[in-house]
């Protein structure tokens, strides 16, 4: 006769199953398991006296005959497409199966064969997500990479050459020489990388040159002059080469207003950075652009979410980042024009509605590279507390909201920049860039970060201890972050033109180089779970924001979860 087990004991042994609920960190966000792909009574688990042993859960299947390299057992997957319990099989650095692991000689329905060549990672009691993708990186210092991967981010796109004055302000790697050096530097960093060329030019020749040198996108920044002519020229180049254009528009409205920028874009695909405007853009109404079908709107994390400290910290931050002088009244006025409580408050709600589709960092240039995922789910928490249950959710769970917010830092930036054929989700065929979280530390401190199917970062105790767990326990780089294992565990994203020109061979790059693709002709409709297109209007006197005629406003948070409770300093 079958053995019956109560839900609590089952969850403690094999992780939560269908209908079980889990709180994320110390937030008010609750997920509920929608489906369990494992088989009751036939689950696999590693350990002494447990299932994955020779002749039991482990069969005789060789790697060549189909056994996986690694199995993650009983993981609770949170992704844009669902919240499910499953075993996950990894092979050749990629996700090869999501389903039921085990020994096909003794079990039915096995989709992930475990053999003598299979490693096991215990996913029970853990949440599994895709590695985060941050598409707004100022490459000011290489130490950002360690901070990013420690937070669960495994792909970084942006621009820069180090702590140059231009890089401190703008996400551009200008010119073929600098693009080449940054591509070579990427070989020594344990994440996926791609670099934006400078897009500010009124004629295309210098932009063509940068794309052929390997730039995976182009960045228009107001500090270099984001004029209608530059916008039109840059987008023309992008359309010819299939790369994305990112834009930081004209705060001072010197060359035109938001209407002029929209006209210059001419309905072409464009990724608008910090679309609310505190990070830069037409004052006070750049936020309007999130209602355009061809616009892929993102936020940077200093305004995520709106709190009692947001306005105060932004002024000094802005003065430093954009090389302004507090003794010059015009510089101070420029800074003050960008910081508006009304538009920042509206940004919270526009994210909750799915009108803003992406969240990124703006690393060391009005943003924090290690807080993208944290601030995303702080925003989700704040919106649940202030706005209540989202349409599609209920009193039991926040699954709709969670799938909306996880998409903002995984699949949507991947789609926007033509990376989604490689990364951005927990789906078969994708690079195995995966993050395991203890639920109590979700979004704050990952337990394990895999890059290309190998462990690159993990919480680890005293290296001289007799077991891995004695303190001090903190995140540390693992073997996939060292030596010859690093490069094959990562990808470098280039333009197809750069690959055709032989850039990887000419530079002697060791990291596999892949093209960005399908960046043109996409729009809000392609953003997963974030496709809202409200008509947004801004009162020019009060800065109040209206969406489809409804005032968007909320109070600043006085306290947030996922914050000081998790950090000693």
Curated annotation (Swiss-Prot):
The active site is at residue 322. The modification N6-carboxylysine is found at residue 219. Its EC number is 3.5.1.5. The keyword Cytoplasm applies. Ni(2+) 1 binds at residues 136, 138, 219, 362. Binds 2 nickel ions per subunit. Ni(2+) 2 binds at residues 219, 248, 274. Pathway: Nitrogen metabolism; urea degradation; CO(2) and NH(3) from urea (urease route): step 1/1. The keyword Hydrolase applies. GO terms for biological process: urea catabolic process. Its cofactor is Ni cation. GO terms for molecular function: nickel cation binding; urease activity. HAMAP family: Urease_alpha. NCBIfam families: PRK13206.1, PRK13207.1, urease_alph. This is Urease subunit alpha. It comes from Synechococcus sp. (strain RCC307). The lineage of its organism: Bacteria, Bacillati, Cyanobacteriota, Cyanophyceae, Synechococcales.
């Amino acid at each position: 006769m079958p053995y019956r087990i109560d839900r609590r004991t089952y969850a403690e042994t094999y992780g939560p199953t269908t209908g079980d609920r889990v709180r994320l960190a110390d937030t008010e966000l609750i997920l509920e398991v929608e489906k369990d792909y494992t088989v009751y009574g036939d689950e696999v688990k590693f350990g002494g006296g447990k299932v994955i042993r020779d002749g039991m859960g482990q069969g005789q299947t060789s790697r060549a005959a189909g056994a996986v390299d690694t199995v993650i057992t009983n993981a609770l997957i949170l992704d844009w497409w669902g919240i499910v319990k499953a075993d996950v099989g990894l092979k050749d650095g990629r996700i090869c199966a999501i389903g039921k692991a085990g020994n096909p000689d003794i079990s039915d329905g096995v989709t992930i064969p475990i053999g003598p060549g299979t490693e096991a990672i215990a996913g029970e009691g853990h949440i599994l997500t895709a590695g985060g993708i941050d598409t707004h990186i100022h490459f000011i210092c290489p130490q950002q990479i360690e901070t990013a991967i420690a937070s669960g981010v495994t792909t970084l796109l942006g621009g820069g050459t180090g702590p140059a004055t231009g890089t401190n302000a703008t996400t551009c790697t200008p010119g073929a020489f600098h693009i080449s050096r940054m591509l070579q530097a990427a070989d020594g960093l344990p994440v996926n990388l791609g670099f934006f060329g400078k897009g500010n030019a009124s004629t295309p020749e210098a932009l063509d040159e940068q794309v052929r040198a390997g730039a995976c996108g182009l960045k228009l920044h107001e500090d270099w002059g984001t004029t209608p002519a530059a916008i039109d020229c840059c987008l023309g180049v992008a359309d010819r080469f299939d790369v994305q254009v990112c834009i930081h528009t004209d705060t001072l409205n010197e060359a035109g207003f938001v209407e002029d920028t929209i006209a210059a874009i001419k309905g072409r695909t464009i990724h608008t950075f910090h679309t609310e405007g505190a990070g830069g853009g037409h004052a006070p109404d750049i936020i309007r652009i999130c209602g355009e079908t061809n616009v892929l709107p993102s936020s940077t994390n200093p305004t995520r979410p709106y709190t009692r400290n947001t306005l105060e910290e932004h002024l000094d931050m802005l003065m430093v980042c954009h090389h302004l002088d507090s003794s010059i009244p015009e510089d101070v006025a420029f800074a003050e024009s960008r910081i508006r409580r009304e538009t920042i408050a509206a940004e919270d709600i526009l994210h909750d509605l799915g009108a803003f589709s992406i969240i990124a960092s703006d690393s060391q240039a009005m943003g924090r590279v290690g807080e993208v995922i944290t601030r995303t789910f702080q925003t989700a928490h704040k919106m649940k507390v202030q706005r209540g249950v989202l349409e599609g959710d209920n009193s039991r769970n926040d699954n709709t909201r969670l799938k909306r917010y996880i998409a903002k830092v995984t699949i949507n930036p991947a789609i926007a920049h033509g990376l989604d054929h490689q990364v951005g989700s927990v789906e078969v065929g994708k690079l195995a860039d995966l993050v395991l979280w203890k639920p109590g530390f979700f979004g704050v401190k990952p337990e394990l970060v895999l890059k290309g199917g190998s462990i690159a970062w993990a919480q680890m105790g005293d290296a001289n201890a007799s077991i891995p767990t004695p303190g001090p326990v903190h995140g540390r780089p693992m073997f996939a972050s060292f030596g010859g294992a690093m490069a094959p565990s990562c990808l470098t994203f280039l333009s197809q033109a750069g690959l055709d020109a032989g850039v990887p061979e000419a530079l002697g790059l060791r990291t596999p180089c892949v093209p960005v693709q399908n960046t043109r002709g996409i729009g809000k409709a392609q953003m997963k779970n974030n496709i809202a297109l409200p008509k947004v209007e801004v009162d020019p006197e009060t800065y109040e924001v209206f969406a489809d005629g409804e005032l968007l406003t909320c109070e600043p948070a006085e306290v947030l979860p996922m914050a000081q409770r998790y950090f000693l300093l």
